[in-house]
């Protein structure tokens, strides 16, 4: 509706409010206001006439447009000028427009105002592609959605263009969102919860954990099928929604903004995943890994890290996997180096060492100095690292070889994993083990690699197998093959 003082003495019905006094103005809007469109549509009007006396104000586009440095006085706008989607623009005029848009709009400048530019007549310019690339790279400019472009040919061999916001959505929503960006401390409070880790991956863990603990997934349409764009708008999700409710776009945009805040390259990708979807690729080392935080929303009893720091094949990128689970509209995959395997890292949790292997799983690789003196080893629940839970799907090769402190082993093949594996020589030489419990009640197979249970025990150990008769028989056979000689079963 416009702007008003706190006691609503007067309302300014305009979206162009200039600072004149110390009076604080508050955005006024209708309750349950609906948005008719969120699409980043670009409409072109070629019946427009350019003012011949105003030609000098139109920036001539080419790839050499100089970029301004970001000021980033407000945390919300702390991002880099050129994002990864810029690489998907293959024409000089398009790259020039991208840079000109950054110069005009960065740090929250010129909210809801149009930009003037010109191109040499005959030069190609993919307006929709440029606008989409720019808005995907800069979700902090949340008020930028659809736009209209007025075009007119000049007598000097140039085509003059005026690109302005589209009003298919409610203009007061733009005012409201920008006002909350400048005055809300909710984003800053979320950032304070994110600790910068020792490594890039540790920082990403903390970002993902904070986002998924505070954002909640919701549907973006009502029972009548009417869509509301607010759940796709980062400014609304963070600064206005009490429960931080959003759809996939909200997760992807917030993740990118926080990554950029900590200096981590991240791209959000819009496309298809059996329906419209949005996800991220984030750079760790020299490669980009797939992240889909929608799977980890705070409504889940346990955060699912299946789609976190994954390889391109898992994400169904065309050329790696025929299923095409996620297909990008802009095919940014052609321009950045995607990882073909999940991101793996070695971590220590408590008394044991693990390798996170992808798909929400990890391998128990060994013990710390204190862990080597543990007498009872139980593997059932997951491992929590940086607030994210990973299922143990394997005991690594030689993980406990020649450990004479171990007396009891209890392994449960949890429901989440397909197969549990005990690696080569994992317990070889653990001659003092007296009790082994293998819980296979979910019907998951437990595989034993060569010499994994070659204990070298002089006394018989007792093996308790919790499973179906068929699996129990199979497990006993595999244990013998794995080197276990002296044992009795329940």
Question: Language-model segments: what does each one mean?
Answer:
Residues 300-345:
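Low-complexity, Gly/Ser/Thr/Pro-rich intrinsically disordered linker/tail segments
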Residues 1-15, 397:
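Surface-exposed interfaces of beta-sheet-rich extracellular modules
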Residues 12-34, 162-168, 430, 452-453:
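Conserved "repeat-terminator" motif of extracellular CCP/Sushi domains
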Residues 173-240:
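Secondary-structure boundary elements
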Residues 37-164:
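Intrinsically disordered, low-complexity N-terminal segments that are enriched in acidic
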């Amino acid at each position: 509706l416009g702007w008003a003082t706190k006691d609503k003495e007067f309302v300014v019905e305009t979206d162009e409010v200039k600072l004149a006094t110390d009076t604080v103005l508050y955005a006024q809007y209708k309750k349950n206001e609906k948005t008719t469109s969120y699409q980043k549509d670009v409409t072109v009007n070629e019946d427009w006439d350019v003012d011949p006396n105003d030609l000098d104000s139109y920036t001539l586009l080419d790839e050499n447009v100089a970029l301004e440095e970001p000021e980033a006085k407000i945390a919300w706008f702390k991002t880099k000028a050129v994002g990864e989607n810029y690489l998907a623009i293959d024409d000089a005029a398009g790259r020039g427009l991208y840079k000109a848009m950054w110069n005009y709009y960065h740090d929250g400048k010129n909210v809801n105002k149009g930009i003037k530019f010109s191109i040499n007549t005959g030069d190609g310019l993919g307006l929709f592609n440029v606008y989409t690339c720019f808005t995907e790279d800069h979700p902090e400019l949340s008020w930028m959605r659809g736009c209209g472009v007025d075009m007119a040919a000049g007598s000097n061999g140039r085509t003059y263009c005026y690109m302005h916001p589209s009003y298919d959505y409610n203009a007061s929503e733009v005012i409201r969102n920008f006002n909350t960006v400048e005055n809300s401390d909710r984003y800053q409070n979320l950032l304070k919860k994110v600790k910068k880790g020792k490594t890039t991956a540790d920082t990403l863990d903390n970002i993902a954990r904070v986002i998924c603990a505070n954002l909640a997934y919701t549907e973006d349409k009502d029972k009548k099928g009417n869509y509301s764009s607010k759940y796709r708008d980062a400014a609304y999700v963070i600064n206005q929604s009490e429960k931080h409710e959003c759809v996939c776009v909200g997760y992807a945009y917030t993740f990118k903004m926080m990554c950029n805040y900590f200096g981590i390259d991240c791209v959000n990708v819009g496309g298809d995943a059996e329906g419209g979807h949005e996800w991220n690729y984030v750079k760790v080392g020299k490669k980009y890994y797939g992240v889909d935080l929608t799977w980890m929303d705070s409504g889940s009893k346990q955060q699912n890290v299946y789609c976190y720091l994954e390889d391109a094949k898992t994400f169904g990128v065309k050329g790696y996997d025929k299923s095409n689970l996620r297909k990008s509209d802009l095919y940014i995959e052609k321009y950045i180096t995607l990882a073909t395997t999940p991101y793996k890292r070695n971590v220590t949790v408590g008394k044991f060492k693990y390798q996170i292997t992808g798909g929400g799983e990890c391998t128990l690789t060994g013990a710390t100095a204190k862990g080597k003196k543990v007498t009872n080893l139980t593997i059932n629940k997951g491992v929590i690292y940086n607030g994210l839970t990973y299922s143990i799907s394997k005991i690594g090769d030689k993980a406990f070889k020649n450990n004479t402190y171990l007396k009891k082993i209890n392994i449960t093949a949890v429901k989440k994993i397909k197969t549990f594996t005990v690696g080569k020589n994992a317990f070889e030489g653990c001659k003092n083990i007296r009790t082994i419990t293998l819980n296979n009640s979910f019907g998951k197979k437990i595989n034993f690699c060569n010499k994994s249970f070659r204990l070298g025990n002089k006394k018989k150990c007792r093996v308790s197998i919790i499973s179906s008769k068929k699996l129990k028989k199979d497990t006993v056979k595999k244990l013998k093959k794995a080197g276990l000689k002296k044992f009795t079963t329940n």
